């Protein structure tokens, strides 16, 4: 059922305040520095991104994303740099984004299956200027148990990824290596609970 629901919304990821999908963004000045080219990593990710996660395009060139900042549980200031040494699947979502809401149980299942000392699904809520309790209520009502509570209520995280040309709308998902370098990116939802996603993550963890 989840795969079917996601398939029905795959082309309908949301750009609040703008059109739905299809509009490329031009990276602004102050762009993140590029990481050293690693053809082997790009080739491995491209080979593993099939089926449910075929839209996860390998980063060519890669970008250094350690500076992306957000809040962790209890409001603790964090950045991707705090996850150095771990592979991260960074997902930006909002409670008003229907495809995001449908995708969350699959992300939770992926964290339950693959989350360990070397990997974490970091799902960051980007609801801005709204009732922040709405996020916790949604997570509780949806039965999200494995994902930690990450948030960035000022939209600066989304805008940073948008400036880099990575985010066109929500949800947006970035696979980030142990060194903080982008491995691959995707706009729109996916079935993260399936075998294809697990294979991609296991490949990334081995890089």
Each model region followed by its residue ranges:
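N-terminal targeting signals for export/organelle localization
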Residues: 1-65, 207
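A short beta-strand-turn-helix
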Residues: 57-62, 67-88
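Conserved redox-active cysteine motifs that mediate thiol-disulfide chemistry
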Residues: 84, 92-109
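Loop/turn elements at helix/coil->beta-strand transitions in domains of secreted/extracellular proteins
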Residues: 85-88, 117-120, 145-147
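Short pre-active-site segment immediately N-terminal to redox-active cysteine/selenocysteine motifs
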Residues: 86-88, 92-96, 128, 169
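Conserved hydrophobic packing residues within short motifs/helices of P-loop NTPase cores
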Residues: 88-90, 122-124, 174
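Structural microenvironment flanking redox-active thiols in thiol-disulfide oxidoreductases
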Residues: 101-143, 153-161
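Thiol/disulfide oxidoreductase modules built on the thioredoxin-like
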Residues: 141-146, 151-203
């Amino acid at each position: 059922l989840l795969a079917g629901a996601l398939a029905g919304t795959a082309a309908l990821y949301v750009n609040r305040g703008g059109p739905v999908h299809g509009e490329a963004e031009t990276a602004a000045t102050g762009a993140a520095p590029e990481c050293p080219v690693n053809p082997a990593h790009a080739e491995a990710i491209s080979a593993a991104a099939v089926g449910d996660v075929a839209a996860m395009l390998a980063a060519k060139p890669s970008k250094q994303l350690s500076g992306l900042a957000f809040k962790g549980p209890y409001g603790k200031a964090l950045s991707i740099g705090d996850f150095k040494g771990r592979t991260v699947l960074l997902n930006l979502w909002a409670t008003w984004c229907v495809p995001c809401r449908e995708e969350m149980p699959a992300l939770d299942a992926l964290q339950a299956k693959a989350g360990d000392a070397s990997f974490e699904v970091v799902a960051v809520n980007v609801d801005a200027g709204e009732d922040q309790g709405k996020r916790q209520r949604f997570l509780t009502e949806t039965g999200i148990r494995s994902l930690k509570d990450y948030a960035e209520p000022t939209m600066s995280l989304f805008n940073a990824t948008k400036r880099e040309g990575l985010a066109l709308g929500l949800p947006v998902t970035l696979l980030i290596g142990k060194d903080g370098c982008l491995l691959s990116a995707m706009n729109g939802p996916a079935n993260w609970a399936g075998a294809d996603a697990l294979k991609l993550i296991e490949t990334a963890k081995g890089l």
